[in-house]
């Protein structure tokens, strides 16, 4: 399989319950994974704070070179305090936010101006929900770092994934 990064979702609640970082490190060892090929996304469903459990979790990820991502940025409680306090490797702009930006001048301007603001503190941006070539081109124009969406491929099982991507040639 060519080089790729696999993202794993964890919730803030899982982090607070403790030892999710141990489960991640155990899986890395068990499957002989390279830490730079794994990325941990924190799904966001409520208020998040810098609790001792969260600080331990982040410290473990940093110590082991595992990127940390705030998922669904632009919705709910994921806000600027999350970026400031949690110091993610990158944030994933919510797919609905992306879709609105592609269909509204006002939302486009907001989206476009979030990118340099986040870049200036060395946090990268992933745009979720890229479904059309036109959206891809607009995101490149805005200097979005990573892109994700059905334009590139739909969710699939292991066998289909290996068939599609094992040769490394099915990338748009």
Q: Model regions: which residues?
A:
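EAL-family c-di-GMP phosphodiesterase catalytic domain
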Residues: 11-18, 37-51, 64-172
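Catalytic-core regions built around general acid/base machinery
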Residues: 24-30, 56-64, 113
């Amino acid at each position: 399989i060519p080089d790729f990064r696999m993202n794993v979702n964890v919730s803030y609640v899982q982090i607070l319950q403790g030892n999710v970082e141990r489960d991640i490190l155990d899986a890395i060892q068990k499957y002989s994974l390279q830490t730079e090929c794994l990325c941990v996304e924190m799904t966001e469903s409520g208020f998040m704070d810098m609790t001792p459990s969260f600080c331990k979790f982040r410290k473990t990820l940093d110590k082991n070179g595992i990127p940390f991502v705030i998922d669904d940025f632009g919705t709910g409680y994921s806000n600027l305090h999350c970026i400031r306090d949690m110091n993610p490797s990158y944030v994933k702009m919510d797919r609905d936010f992306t879709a609105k930006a592609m269909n509204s001048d006002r939302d486009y301007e907001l989206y476009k101006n979030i990118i340099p603001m986040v870049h200036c503190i060395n946090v990268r941006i992933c745009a979720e929900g890229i479904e059309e070539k036109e959206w891809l081109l607009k995101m490149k124009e805005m200097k979005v770092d990573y892109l994700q969406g059905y334009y590139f491929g739909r969710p699939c099982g292991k066998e289909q994934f290996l068939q599609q991507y094992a040769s490394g040639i099915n990338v748009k």
